[in-house]
Amino acid sequence: VIVIDHHIAGPELPKAHSVVNPNRLDEDGAYGYLCATSVVFVVIAGMLRTLRQRGYFSTTSPAPDLLSQLDLVALATVCDVVPLVGLNRAFVRQGLKVMAQRQHHGLVKLADIAGVNEAPNVYALGFLLGPRINAAGRLGASGLGVKLLAAEDPDTAAGLALQLDDMNTERRRIEES
């Protein structure tokens, strides 16, 4: 078991093969500003580097394109409201470029419903897309956001994006009452 976290850790760590957390008491805190998704991204990047060095990948079995996932890292970074410094700033800047390529069906359909018609920016992530994804969790259906982000076809993504948009409308109605 590998535990990955970003919250400030106490003196006792979970029983696991490894606990990766830049906010452990025995860490220097240089990356304590990262959100959990960014920590996961860095861990996976390190794993891929090690696998490359050991010759695991080849022309017939290439390494996954981790950079194509930076749009998801950017979304998580902005929505977790962590400081936009250091790696966070780099992840968001590059992630917005990836998002502008409109590769992830779920983000494309959600952006379309949310009216993000131009190149995405931090405002779109934090105030238009993020709240729609988070609304499902607030209404007891947190898995819906994950399904959207993992959707592999546009039709499924469109239906999920519509559901999330409806849930966000319901969430706002509840919060206003």
Predicted regions and their residues:
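Short, glycine/acidic-enriched loop or turn micro-motifs at the edges of active sites
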Residues: 8-9, 24, 83
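Short, glycine/polar-rich helix-capping loops at beta-to-alpha or helix-loop-helix junctions
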Residues: 4-15
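Short alpha-helices
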Residues: 15-58, 66-78
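Phosphate/diphosphate-binding loops
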Residues: 1
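Short capping/connector residues at structural and topological boundaries
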Residues: 13, 18, 25, 39, ...
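Hydrophobic helix-and-loop "lid/oligomerization" segment in the mid-to-C-terminal part
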Residues: 49-177
